[in-house]
């Protein structure tokens, strides 16, 4: 049986995901899109990414790879039994294979707060307006590719204004969009 194999390298401020596709994987799930780059990274200066729970990393990997997985997605770390059971209830096309025995599940702590994938546009600004006051708006600041019409200046300015009025807006360097 073949599968997508995921490798992760990380430091305090960066997580790098590398994906190895094998024969049964779906390189082109439809005529409209295909697996682009075989790697992605997330960088931030304000959070220790080594503290991210494995279940959250696994969820991120599933969301990145889902259209392309053939029969199995192989994770390079342990996950909790609770997460594995939850995934089995949702994923039907493929299975998740993690390394070794289970780890404790992620506990929800009262000091945690909600976050919002903030684009800087009208919709995410409206969503932020109805979220709890302690919501952290997170802008996924992707690199601008050569020839692109995309201009992040307005979103950068929105984040700056949010910080000025008391929000804790974060710009996270992220190239997930180019998978």
Predicted segments — roles?
Residues 1-5:
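Intrinsically disordered, low-structural-confidence terminal and linker regions
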